[in-house]
Amino acid sequence: FLLLTFGALLNIVTTDNIGTLASQWEVMTWASFALVAWERTSKARDAAIKYVVLCCSAAYLMIVGFFMIGGNHTQYGEIVANLSVHSDDVLKFALVFTLLGFAAKAGLVPLHSWLPDAHPAAPSSVSAPLSGVLTKMGVFGVVTLCNSWLEDLPDYQNADAYNTAQPTMVY
């Protein structure tokens, strides 16, 4: 399951296709679910269930967010190029939904409740990649979205978005 997780991680960072990203995101989540539940104790099972429910729910919101703005486009570059055709309300909802999907995996507040349970429940050989790589995949998604979707905002709104994110990084 560890190699499956790492393969999905590699596919996520190298793809420009939203369908591939979504499918590999789910592969990463379910493979890491199996790794967290590996010990087969009640603590590990509960932690794994909490992890998969929270991360899958948020990932489904992320997929909805991409569908809201994607339309007939599946390439990330095409979606970003066509952001101007959508109303501000659609863009706001799509951004929030998509950020929630990435934020849950990154363990950002208030979607971080799975972290304290999953790390001690997982074997030590899994806990390190879980904290060192998997959670950073969520950060990768947040940074990618902010750099591509928020670049056209006026400077004060862009600064507000980043200033709102900074306390989350510290907490």
Go through each PLM region and give its residues.
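Internal transmembrane alpha-helices of multipass membrane proteins
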Residues: 1-60, 123, 132, 137, ...
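Alpha-helical membrane-protein architecture signal
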Residues: 4, 93-96, 126
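Juxtamembrane/interfacial segments at transmembrane-helix boundaries in multi-pass membrane proteins
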Residues: 27, 58-118, 139-171
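Juxtamembrane helix-boundary/capping and inter-helix hinge elements in multi-pass membrane proteins
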Residues: 39-45, 73-74, 116-126, 151
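Short, surface-exposed, polar/charged, turn-prone segments marking secondary-structure boundaries
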Residues: 50-51, 126, 156-157
